[in-house]
Structure formats: structure tokens, C-alpha cells
UniProtKB/Swiss-Prot annotation:
Annotated GO CC locations: cytosol
Function: Could be a nuclease involved in processing of the 5'-end of pre-16S rRNA.
Organism of origin: Thermoanaerobacter pseudethanolicus (strain ATCC 33223 / 39E)
Principal subcellular localization: cytoplasm
Domain of life assignment: Bacteria
Record's subcellular location: Cytoplasm
Keywords: Cytoplasm, Hydrolase, Nuclease, Ribosome biogenesis
A GO MF term: nuclease activity
InterPro entries given in the database record: RNaseH-like_sf, YqgF, YqgF/RNaseH-like_dom, YqgF/RNaseH-like_dom_sf
E.C. no: 3.1.-.-
Protein name per its UniProtKB record: Putative pre-16S rRNA nuclease
GO BP term, example: rRNA 5'-end processing
């Protein structure tokens, strides 16, 4: 079974997918947001194409663990996602994943600012999903 990771933002949704063994996450695409209906159609295509059995959605929290405005938006998105799909959907603490993704792209990949904007959400989705996959190995 493959697992999908989502980094949900106001303008884009970063998408990552696991390998069949649930060990490694890789970036798949970035969905440009338009409406929940269209976003969900694209997510459904990916679920069907990759035979996804679970979705991990990054939940942005403040450093003190509370939910800010973006976290509340993601919670609403996930409520609709659960209504649209009958597979397990898990919220995963994504604190600092976007910061880490930016650091990786600057320090390790030496990618320009314009190019970073294109891939940052996809990389954040990879980090969210990989953190989840790693946590499951230890169980």
C-alpha cells in the first residue's frame, strides 16, 4: 500500500507518495489550488493511479502546540477530505517542515529563489510523509 503526504497551503498543495513498502517518500507534484472540488478531483486521480491506501496531511501548529489560522484552515480542508474519501486520513505535526525544506534547497541543492518557490511545497510534503514513515518503523 502506498501512502500519500499532503502539504496544504492557500495557493498550492504539495504532494508526496511513498514506495510500496512504506519506507521512502518522494515528491510527486504540486497542485495549484482552485476549489475543493477540483483539488479533490486531482487528489482522487493520484489515489487511483498510485493505489493510495492512506493520506497523511501536515498540520501547521504554532511552536507552543496551538493551532493558528493556517492550522484551522487545514482542519477544515481535512474535514472535507474525509467526507470525499473513504481511506484513513491522519493529521501530522508539520512544525518547521517548510523551514527545513527551504534550508535543504538553499544549502544542499543551491537552488535559486524562483526555482525554490516551485518545489518548496512538494519538498515539505516529502518531509511530512517521511517523518510519518520513520515514526512507524519504530513501532
Amino acid at each position: 500500500m502506498r501512502i500519500m503526504g499532503l502539504d496544504v497551503g492557500d495557493k498550492t498543495i504539495g504532494v508526496a507518495i511513498s514506495d510500496l513498502s512504506g519506507t521512502i517518500a518522494q515528491g510527486l507534484t504540486t497542485i495549484k489550488r482552485s476549489s475543493n472540488k477540483k483539488d479533490f478531483e486531482r487528489i482522487k486521480q493520484i489515489i487511483n493511479e498510485y493505489e493510495v491506501g492512506m493520506i497523511i496531511v501536515g498540520l501547521p501548529k504554532n511552536m507552543n502546540g496551538t493551532l493558528g489560522p493556517q492550522g484551522q484552515k487545514v482542519m477544515r480542508f481535512v474535514e472535507h477530505l474525509k467526507e470525499a474519501f473513504s481511506i484513513p486520513i491522519i493529521l501530522w505535526d508539520e512544525r518547521l517542515t517548510t523551514v527545513e525544506a527551504q534550508r535543504v534547497l538553499i544549502e544542499k541543492a543551491d537552488i535559486s529563489r524562483a526555482k525554490r518557490k516551485e518545489v518548496i511545497d512538494k519538498l515539505a510534503a516529502v518531509l511530512i510523509l517521511q517523518n510519518y514513515l520513520d515514526s512507524q518503523k519504530n513501532k
